[in-house]
Swiss-Prot record:
This is Putative pre-16S rRNA nuclease. It comes from Nostoc sp. (strain PCC 7120 / SAG 25.82 / UTEX 2576). SMART domains: YqgFc. NCBIfam families: RNAse_H_YqgF. Transmembrane segments: none annotated. GO terms for cellular component: cytosol.
Length: 151
């Protein structure tokens, strides 16, 4: 019997939060929307609506480590926002190393002949999908490894 998962991937930035969801099997992540950050309460309300609609069980948040692997100022800001958000939504959080996901998202847009400079929200959604996909892939690999060990 397959265990269903409903995770929400978030790419948290100063101005926007990219949001991604996954299919119920946990195989494919896709961008859903971009939340324009205005106030914390409004941000929570917009994300709460998505959480309710999709019956989300866990938040997967990209943590922007520095290239040397340390947590810089931006990573601490993301943790602070996420901690408050998780408490408001009463959901667990799992962090994923998001180094270079925005760059990867921009490269994907360029490959599609879409201007990254005019589509910042789309970059955030794609980055959120990359973050969530990374988490889903790790989760699936770990599940397969534990099944292999049982035999």
């Amino acid at each position: 019997m397959t265990k269903y998962i409903s995770a929400l991937g978030l790419d948290v930035g100063r101005k926007r939060v990219g949001v991604a969801g996954c299919d119920r099997t946990g195989l494919i992540a896709t961008g859903i929307t971009t939340v324009e950050r205005t106030s914390f309460d409004r941000d929570v309300q917009q994300i709460q609506n998505i959480v309710n609609e999709r019956q989300v069980q866990v938040l997967v948040v990209g943590l922007p480590y520095s290239m040397d692997g340390s947590l810089g100022f931006q990573a601490r800001q993301v943790q602070k926002f996420t901690s408050r958000l998780a408490k408001a939504l009463q959901l667990p959080v799992e962090y994923v190393d998001e180094r270079l996901t925005s760059f990867q998202a921009e490269q994907m847009l360029i490959a599609e002949n879409v201007s990254p400079s005019r589509n910042k929200g789309l970059i955030d959604r794609k980055a959120a999908a990359l973050i969530l996909q990374q988490w889903l892939d790790i989760r699936r690999t770990n599940a397969q490894s534990s099944v292999a060990v049982e035999y």
